[in-house]
Amino acid sequence: MTWKQNETEIRQRIKEGQYDGPTTGLMNGFTQANLVILPQNLAYDFLLFCQRNPKPCPLLEVIDTGKYEPKETAPGKDLRTDLPRYYIYRDGVKSAEVTDINKYWTQDLVSFLLGCSFTFESFFLQRGVPVRHIEEGVNVPMYRTNIKCKDAGVFHGNMVVSMRPIPENKLTEAIQITSRFPAVHGAPIHIGSPEKIGIKDLDSPDFGNRVNVESGEIPVFWACGVTPQAVIMNYRPEFVITHAPGHMFITDKKDMDYFQL
């Protein structure tokens, strides 16, 4: 057994900064989450933004002001250390990329955990639906689109999507699987024709890495929890912390906890 198959060792390596890579494919079966941390004076507007845009921003948990333990999704864990990599934004611009946010922590911060599409990938693998970024050992490709989100207070902007190439004969199955997970982005937001949602070049993702789209495959797009980062860049708040795209928080929840019949 390698360390990547050992739950305890994975968590320990991430906490200690020994692993700072993408979390796709790690601890299959455990739900992963996007993280947004912002000052209390912005928390209500962001909560409203998530409620109005549940496809890209499905709320899993909101942590009390100044607290960093996600008691609902991962009791005993610490959001300041338990992600592989974080982005620090100042005035809407990424100013640092770190593996520990203890020195940035203040008592007025509110943390939000949002559902992540990595959750349904283990079901793809079980059913023989390929997950190209796992096959190629890279981060999932993510793209800005022309799909507008609903405004909420100071927050406004367009949706970010993740893309997975799906063989034509597996497309229906992929849609059926993901539609059972509304808490983690659910069914695709768009299928094929990337130009129709404002994506000019699949080989040039805005976040993550490019993957190969093979003959007989269709690019399929899911709403993505990196959307808040794009929205934050629009508003340019003084200070925000997020996960680095693809470097998620691994909760104690199981993927099946979010499966709906």
UniProtKB/Swiss-Prot annotation:
Entries under Gene3D superfamilies matching the protein:
PSTPO5379-like (3.40.1640.10), PSTPO5379-like domain (3.30.2040.10)
Pfam families according to UniProt: D-Glu_cyclase
Presence of keyword Lyase: yes
Where does the chain cross the membrane?
none
The EC code for this enzyme is 4.2.1.-
Its domain of life?
Bacteria
> Among its keywords, does the record have Zinc-finger?
no
Q: Name one GO molecular function term.
A: lyase activity
What span is annotated as the signal peptide, if there is one? none
Family as reported in the entry's similarity comment: Belongs to the D-glutamate cyclase family.
Q: Which NCBIfam families match?
A: PRK05463.1
**Name of this chain's protein:** Putative hydro-lyase Nther_1142
Q: What species does this protein belong to?
A: Natranaerobius thermophilus (strain ATCC BAA-1301 / DSM 18059 / JW/NM-WN-LF)
